[in-house]
Structure formats: structure tokens, C-alpha cells
Amino acid sequence: KADGPCRTVTAGFLIGSDGANSVVRDGIGVSWVDLGFEEDWLVVDFKPHDPEMEIDMPGAGQYCDPERPVSTFRWLGRSHSRVEFMLLPGETAEQMTAESRCWELLSRWKITPDNATIIRRTVYTFQSKLADQWRRDRVLLIGDAAHLMPPFMGQGMCSGIRDAANLGWKLDLVLSGRAEATLLDSYTEERRPHVETVIELSMELGRIVCISDPALAAERDESFRSGRAPTLPEFPSLTEGFLHRAIDGQPTAAAGTLSVQPRVCYQGRTALLDDIIGSGWTLMSRVPIHRLELSPSHSSFLSALGVRTLHITQAEVAEAVIDIDADVTRWLDGLDSDVVLVRPDFYVYGIAWRSDAGALVESLRQQLEPHLIKTSV
């Protein structure tokens, strides 16, 4: 337990990003909703004495072995590796974390004390949980403080980054005096159902990997060999919150999907688009911005919201962003549109033809307006 001096800090908001055993979550009385996955796995991190040592394991792999399911990660950074072993019935954390036992398990890949050093050995319980609330007044939860998932899709930290990106742009509007705190209600609305779907996908992969019954494992293997195994659904898009919507309320084409990350050139600098434009809302168009049918009030709204407007083209046009590899061109061709409005968290708000750009901006204004402070935006 912490035994250092106490300090009092005053802030507008408190973000609990303090992990699965979150003190912040417990402090505001938020409970877990258990989605029903729980397996103990031994995690062993090791460092080869020679970083270039040949090890016969995939860069990232799942061994669906009923005798003991295993996950391997050849490279963690430039010099470390990781192997994870599922605990079998009757095995304890104390037994499995014994150094001699870890070397015994690693010997499968000819990893020994002579050629490597174990730097960590611990047992984790892989779980699937969601906090029942992500916001209570001026306290919000992100990352493992808000959700836990099995690691089989590698989406735990990714989901936490999505949380931060989603909450960040909304907090910016609130703290800069442009929006009311009601805007923050959309954080839970948008992120919770998305991460719940990701957890369910991770659980499904975990169920495939963690089979230890030989007969069931044989059935699984045959279903893959024969092609009868069902495919996993596509990675989820955003479906709730601030998205361009059709008359029936459903997101329009591309709304809620992730934007592209092309190589571009702007004012003599070549880089990825995000490095050129920075953070914030972005209106990208393959026709010059002045040719879009935007009213003065729409232009004023975009300016107050801090929206960056970009003309992106393959031609070398003054003040335009050059689409070096035609990634944006192909993307917009596939979307059958000229214009795309991208949120600060890089999700697409909506797309439009140049003649409908004003309607696209107007729909965003109508969605945000109930939360905006009138004198600011």
C-alpha cells in the first residue's frame, strides 16, 4: 500500500486510467459486469543473450494444442520475447511461476539459461468485464479501468487508446469553453457498445484457442481444415453518437468507419497525413474547398469548431495536399463521394458529393448544437 505523503489536487475532471484494479473506479462505486470468460495463463518474458538468436517460433502465433494452448510473441521491442502458457486443471500459480518450471516450458524452443535470461514470470487471469458506468459526474473511466478482455485479438491497449482519443476531443471542447459537460455523455454512448463487441470477438477467439479436450480440439481442427469453421465478423465500426445518419436514423455509408492514413506531400514536406494535419476535425475534399456548396454560416461553424479543410489531389496544385500513392483517391472512388468529414479520433463522421457538403456540415451542427455554448461555436 502507498505510504507516502498525501497531496490535494484540484481539477475540472478526473480520468481514471489506473488499470484493472482501478482505485478511481472503486472510489466512485462503479461495479463490473462479468461477460463470462476467465482463464489463468502463465506469461514468461525472456531476453536472448544474442538479440539475433534464431528461435523457431512465429513472430506472433497461437498454438491450439489441447495438451497446453500456447501464445508466442518473438519480438517485444528489439530484444525481448514472450511466451504464454494456459494453466491446466490442478496447476497453481506458485507451481507454474517457479523458475525451473518456466525453463522446462521454454525448452520446447531450445531456450535455456545458457542462451537467455527470464525477466518476468507471472500468472494473469484473462477476463472479460465491462464497467457498468463509465462516467459519474466529473469522473470518467478509460482503458482497463473501464473494460477487460482476453488478449487473443491484441485489442486491450488498442481499445484504451480509442477511449482516450474519443474522450480527448470532447474534453477539449468542454475545457476550452465551447461545449457543456453534457457532451461527455456521448463518450459512454459511443465507446461502450463498441468495446463490448470487441470483447465478444476476443472471447470467441479465446474459446477456439483454449480448448483442452482432445475430442473437441479434433472437431475444431477438422472444421478449419474442411472450411466449415465460421468466419469471424468484420471488425466493428462505431454505430452510436455523432455520425451522419439517414432518415431512418442508421449511419450512412462509411460513417463510423476509420479514415485512411495515406502518404501525402504538403508545402514540400512528405509524411503521413496525421503528421501533416495534426489533431482535430478534418474536412477533406478532392475538389477545391471554395467550390463546395458551403454557406457563410457553415464556414463560420467549421472555423469555430477548429475544422481543418483540405483539398487533396494527385495533381500538384497550390495549397493542395498531394495524394502521393492515390490512397485517398481510391478510397473516395470506392465510397462514391467527393468529400469526407473526419472526427478528431479518426472515425469518419460522414461522406458527401460536393453539392451535398453543406448538408453534411449542417447535420453535424445540428447534432452538436444542443451541447455547444452559443457564444463560442
Q: Regions from the language model: what does each represent?
A:
Residues 104, 173-377:
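Helical substrate-recognition/capping region of FAD-dependent monooxygenase/halogenase enzymes
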Residues 1-221, 310, 351, 377:
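Core Rossmann-like FAD-binding/catalytic domain of the broad FAD-dependent monooxygenase superfamily
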